[in-house]
Amino acid sequence: MSITVLDPGPLTTVQDAGRVGYAAQGYRSCGAADGYAYRLGNVLVGNDPGAAVLECTLRGAALRFETDTVFALTGAESPAALDSTPVPYYAPLLAKAGSVLQMGAAKTGLRSYLAVGGGIATPPVLGSRATDVKCGIGGLEGRKLTAGDTLPIGSCDTAALWQAITAKRLDRPLRDKAVCGGLHPMRVQGTQMLPLLRAVPGPQDAAFTVQGRQDFIHGIYTLTPDCDRMACKLAGTPLQMRRGADILSDGIVPGSVQVSADGQPIVMLADHQTTGGYAKIATVISADLPSLAQLRPGQRVCFTFVTPSRAVQAARQQAALWQRVRDRL
């Protein structure tokens, strides 16, 4: 069972839940940038939520299924067609052997996910198939995909899986925006509705002046072109510090908001480094990282502080949404 890459688009990689437990050795976790869309895709095709998928950035890939395959598309929606017939997102679909899936440019959002029954079965490295392009490990030879690549698919009884899906009438697109990840906290700023990223105070929040902390939660920030899978660099009112931005390097997690010497926030994403030497004013909660991962350069965001207990509650609520879909299968 396999998939052949005909056109990889700008950036398509194999990703899973990430390489956990090796930060002390300098290995980054990597994994899907939009963890919610990633998990939802897997549960739609009957996989374990941690199975490997394809992540496409800005524009999707063109792929040929070499065997009958159940698949699902989630994340940033783009025009998609299977053998020239339009197909929806957020629905289990059946591709026959030899069928070609073509994905266009995302209409909104940034990253799309293709999950297949059985999962992408490239060799795991340190317990994960996640591609780390900078380190050259995971995925397919530790690199982004190119035309002509062949990706193995894990063992799956496709006929039985599709029969179970159709018998339960699950082969229809999900319409609930909350379940599809389409509902995110927003804030009214003047005449605008802006994505609101919730955060807990960072380990060095005391390094910032009262005015600096106020500017952080009341300001508007624009995503700069310097955004990738590693981090989103923002531009807005410079945040005032009591002393310089540099600190003794310490640990970094997804969502860490470092502030560079120019006073601008940098929010860490999936490919973040393991340590950093800039003061961290906040940490974006895990439930809101999928929202950030789908924003494009030029879009604007704002922040608010929440308590750790509210952060845990939001994570549990988000997990319950995709678990609801899993329970139906």
Per-region residue spans from a language model:
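Conserved "landmark" site that anchors the functional core of diverse proteins
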Residues: 1-329
